Amino acid sequence: MKLNDSNLFRQQALINGEWLDANNGEAIDVTNPANGDKLGSVPKMGADETRAAIDAANRALPAWRALTAKERATILRNWFNLMMEHQDDLARLMTLEQGKPLAEAKGEISYAASFIEWFAEEGKRIYGDTIPGHQADKRLIVIKQPIGVTAAITPWNFPAAMITRKAGPALAAGCTMVLKPASQTPFSALALAELAIRAGVPAGVFNVVTGSAGAVGNELTSNPLVRKLSFTGSTEIGRQLMEQCAKDIKKVSLELGGNAPFIVFDDADLDKAVEGALASKFRNAGQTCVCANRLYVQDGVYDRFAEKLQQAVSKLHIGDGLDNGVTIGPLIDEKAVAKVEEHIADALEKGARVVCGGKAHERGGNFFQPTILVDVPANAKVSKEETFGPLAPLFRFKDEADVIAQANDTEFGLAAYFYARDLSRVFRVGEALEYGIVGINTGIISNEVAPFGGIKASGLGREGSKYGIEDYLEIKYMCIGL
């Protein structure tokens, strides 16, 4: 693997500041989704190694939380600077193991680093309260303290940003962390860990355990030393983890599945709506939890929008993410391809029509053509299930009440989008949509300064913003008698 800094390519896990193999010597191969080539391997660790990482995090906790917020911020700022200095290497590593175009990968590294920078400063603003006493001889004080050892389980679709969005607030608050990255994309996590060491993060404060999801996850959820778990992934797995954490009453943050509606009203700027649909639907080949999954277009502009979207999609360039000009890379694996094919076949069987794409790409493997379906019926699978691929199904709607009812008819509530010019409509629809995030006249919503998270079956808690650090803090009330 060609990197400017070859030491960023790590094939061992990090526990208590040491790079280690699995106790049993077993390993997991990591492949390039663009061509199937083996990139390397990482240790297939289990419960014993995870327990060792938790113990290390627990031992490191007293000294780390005893530092001042400014001292922790200095170390985190070093980490941010190193991420940006090594942006090209980190992006290349990400494209090789995840598949997204290099330009997108570079953007993700910048996005990931922004959480470290943001929370380095937010850690200095963990304020308490002084409450007017209920009695003359009492003083009431509220302070916030780090929750303790935390665990994070992160997905493959954003292998850097989903880590820093958790590690940033945890470390800034004075907590320590044990991370289990996705087995498809562990090298990004290990490279970040290498930079954390260089930044001055003490041994045991940030640990990365690779290996069996079941064995590692079970230890993270059952070990009483872990006081909080943060997970980004499917709703199905999130439910299981929440049940497991209930035994010890662990604090849980969950960022789960989505089924985002993308609504185009008849007063929308159609060119901007198409631009937003491209960004929301086809970024990362549609493999994002906030990507548009259902496109609702009002009758009066349906045909024009479909034509404009088709023209725009036809200009997308599919290929290996390292090649110049590529805008869509491969899907992560064969299962992802099969899910897209299943949703297309189901919609066609129920009356939808393909106007663009509709089948695997001529490159073969995990590549799939960007696809647009029109006249999609409400009972199609794609209206109820998250596709996680480059499929844009267009549904018709008559009026505001109709589309709000359709958009909210789902168990999910992560992100929604709509395009409209009427100011009254903007407020009515924005408030009526049952989602944690609403993008209005924009298809890009994620950043470090705003709260990210969903409602209903899409999760618990918020990441990013001033609220993101709260999930890593405990509130303590002290009543002082004079």
From Swiss-Prot:
It comes from the Bacteria. One of its GO terms (biological process) is protein homotetramerization. Pathway: Amino-acid degradation; 4-aminobutanoate degradation; Amino-acid degradation. One of its GO terms (cellular component) is protein-containing complex. InterPro entries: Ald_DH/histidinol_DH, Ald_DH_C, Ald_DH_CS_CYS, Ald_DH_CS_GLU, Ald_DH_N, Aldehyde_DH_dom, Aldehyde_DH_Superfamily, Succ_semiAld_DH. Its EC number is 1.2.1.79, 1.2.1.-. It catalyses: succinate semialdehyde + NADP(+) + H2O = succinate + NADPH + 2 H(+); 5-oxopentanoate + NADP(+) + H2O = glutarate + NADPH + 2 H(+). The active site is at E255, C289. Transmembrane segments: none annotated. NADP(+) binds at W156, N157, K180, P181, A182, S183, G233, S234, L256, E386. Catalyzes the NADP(+)-dependent oxidation of succinate semialdehyde to succinate. Thereby functions in a GABA degradation pathway that allows some E.coli strains to utilize GABA as a nitrogen source for growth. Also catalyzes the conversion of glutarate semialdehyde to glutarate, as part of a L-lysine degradation pathway that proceeds via cadaverine, glutarate and L-2-hydroxyglutarate. Homotetramer. This is Succinate-semialdehyde dehydrogenase [NADP(+)] GabD. The lineage of its organism: Bacteria, Pseudomonadati, Pseudomonadota, Gammaproteobacteria, Enterobacterales. The gene is gabD.
